[in-house]
């Protein structure tokens, strides 16, 4: 995380250190987030982001489109992002935290078998100015957790790594047919376009890897009023064939069960990846009603949204970012969440009582 000089790295062995920033010690009340930023394209969305004067901005992955096994090429893509005027202003004025997804990991839909993952990890951590002594540099991946604020107003930011240890995806069987041609034909016929994968039935398949699962269990024991779980792919969307937690149904349920077992209140999922924005909700087989606010992309757009039976909103298919505003009022604290387009218009918004995100005693 850049911007906060000393933030508790929740249940880690050290405290992360960074350059001094005037936001130090402030309660987090205005948080923005986004994903999917093509560094070679204009990025006018930053004007709208900056106008909000956020306490924190969270990058959810595909922060650049590297798609390369050459670390020098990947670093050059980050240099393009750094040269974007809006991004540069963001970095100067607002604390930033980041996780990666496949395209800044290095290859489309890649997981644990990606051979250049260590090189990509170094490029990622260097660009986001991770301190040399950070626990993040010692882990099997780039996952991290931060705790900001005083008791009664604590925000925990959980950044899981959904690439470094993830089991390879299981391709759809098309009897030799080409997926791209098959998908184009469906779209031309006005039909939804399922993704190219099926659920992985292997009981040993994993999203996080066992070491990261144990780390996550410890994070959910840390006292916090609000937990922002920043997932690079959707957590609550039902299975569509595209990348999501639903590709690994056992791990998806394991996540919900872990939240229940740890009595971890205040979880709100933030996600990206899909090139449109939506809100998903799940209230079956979960410890309390769970929400997943998806914002995608900062530059990228997709006009054919996939069916999602857990969708609780319309779809915004224009460039966008998401926000979480917290009105801290003790037991009456409320979250205002929503989606803003590149022109600064709030396209969707909702209010959620923080007390509704409370695990049963």
Mark where each language-model region is.
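Metal-dependent phosphoester/phosphodiester hydrolase catalytic core
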Residues: 3-361
